[in-house]
Amino acid sequence: MQNDWQEFKEFFIYIFLFIDKANVESIIMWNLTQNEYLTLMVGVWVVILFLTWFFLWMVFKIVGYFK
């Protein structure tokens, strides 16, 4: 079960965080529990979604000035 969890964690880190192998291995070595890991992933996604929304809002605001 623990080994499955490690593989699951690696898979999600590779899929959701497009980062190089060294960073992935350092995150895997943190030995987070499932709860902590899920909280971290949710936090990362909230930040990504907020930054995306903010970026799009800024683009539309800037485009609005030129209309």
From Swiss-Prot:
Which is a Pfam family this sequence falls into?
Answer: DUF2649
State whether keyword ATP-binding applies.
no
Source organism: Spiroplasma virus SpV1-C74
Bilayer-spanning residue ranges:
10-30, 40-60
Major location category of this protein: host cell
Whether Transmembrane counts among this entry's keywords is yes
**Homology family:** Belongs to the plectrovirus ORF10 family.
Topology term for the membrane: Multi-pass membrane protein
| Protein name per the record | Uncharacterized protein ORF10
For this UniProt record, the keywords arranged alphabetically read as follows: Host membrane, Membrane, Transmembrane, Transmembrane helix
Q: Where in the cell is it found?
A: Host membrane
Q: Could you state one GO cellular component term attached to this entry?
A: membrane
